């Protein structure tokens, strides 16, 4: 492992020197390094990188759509907070969480709503959605944001093409495993979902999974996600207050320690959101460089990979470290 890390860092230093010698005429050196790293993912990898102060950027598979998985919770949060900015919603507004609101997958609310009676504020739900990627909180907030169409329309209003939100997580996961029809409200039970997930795959579920990775719904290109992160950081997507709130919550994200943050220098501040479903593994966020060198938005996606989660995470970690070091060494 140490030898692998050394060789990776040595290669990174080499591209920094090359970039410096070309007086920053484009970021071809960084793009070549991202291309070199891509096979580590074991599948199709997409990366969007933007140095936020200078606008310098580099991409790998820039305009290829990737399933967002839970990274789509960032655009959902943007539309939700836009409604707060417009006075249509209040962060203190309480939302009752009922048993039939349960959505399977990641999160903590499933353990709290086996009996009715729980109510949380929109701000509480926002933090749970982003900090621990809670799917029940996500679906409740997507409803308050007006649904996927409203989120997608908001992205287009910001000038972002290539990012769309279509389904609540309940339906997204159901499509991934080939569960049809989606259970009605009376049938939404955590134990029942656990039984479905633990059952052996069938021909139908395998076919559903294969189709899932090419489904245009709930997908984003690396260019589009990087653009959203850039607008969020520049306070162009939301009011300064809402922008600060969202970025603060993303800095406290509790998932994905081995992804964007995986091999960055200790103490590097990262505001990010992860996403994982099947053969898809993602992490998108903003890195703070040391010594006043600025900030870097990184949107990293992997799809159609049969490698272990650890190995896919390593590919994203290498891409993030490469972007971090590149701009650290080449920013004047």
Put a short name on every predicted segment.
Residues 56-57, 112-114, 207-210, 300-302:
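A short small-residue
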Residues 67, 163-241:
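Active-site-proximal helix/loop microenvironment
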């Amino acid at each position: 492992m140490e030898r692998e890390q050394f060789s990776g860092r040595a290669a990174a230093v080499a591209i920094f020197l090359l970039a410096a010698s070309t007086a920053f005429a484009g970021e071809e050196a960084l793009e070549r390094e991202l291309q070199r790293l891509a096979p580590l993912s074991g599948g199709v990898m997409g990366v969007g990188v933007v140095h936020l102060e200078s606008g310098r950027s580099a991409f790998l598979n820039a305009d290829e759509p990737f399933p967002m998985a839970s990274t789509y919770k960032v655009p959902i949060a943007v539309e939700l907070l836009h409604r707060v900015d417009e006075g249509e919603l209040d962060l203190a507004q309480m939302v009752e969480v009922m048993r039939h609101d349960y959505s399977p997958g990641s999160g903590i609310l499933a353990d709290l709503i086996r009996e009715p009676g729980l109510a949380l504020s929109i701000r509480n739900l926002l933090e749970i959605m982003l900090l621990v990627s809670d799917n029940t909180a996500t679906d409740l907030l997507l409803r308050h944001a007006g649904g996927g169409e409203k989120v997608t329309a908001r992205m287009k209003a910001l000038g972002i093409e290539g990012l769309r939100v279509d389904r609540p997580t309940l339906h997204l996961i159901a499509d991934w495993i080939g569960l049809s029809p989606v259970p009605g409200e009376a049938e939404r039970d955590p134990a029942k979902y656990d039984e479905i997930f633990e059952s052996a795959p069938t021909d139908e579920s395998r076919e559903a999974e294969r189709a899932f990775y090419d489904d245009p719904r709930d997908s984003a290109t690396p260019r589009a996600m990087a653009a959203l992160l850039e607008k969020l950081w520049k306070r162009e997507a939301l009011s300064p207050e809402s922008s600060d709130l969202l970025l603060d919550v993303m800095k406290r994200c509790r998932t994905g320690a081995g992804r964007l943050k995986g091999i960055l220098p200790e103490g590097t501040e990262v505001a990010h959101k992860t996403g994982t479903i099947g053969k898809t593994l993602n992490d998108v966020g903003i890195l703070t460089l040391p010594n006043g060198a600025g900030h870097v938005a990184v949107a990293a996606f992997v799809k159609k990979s049969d490698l272990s989660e650890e190995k896919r995470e390593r590919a994203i970690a290498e891409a993030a470290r490469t972007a971090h070091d590149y701009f650290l060494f080449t920013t004047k």
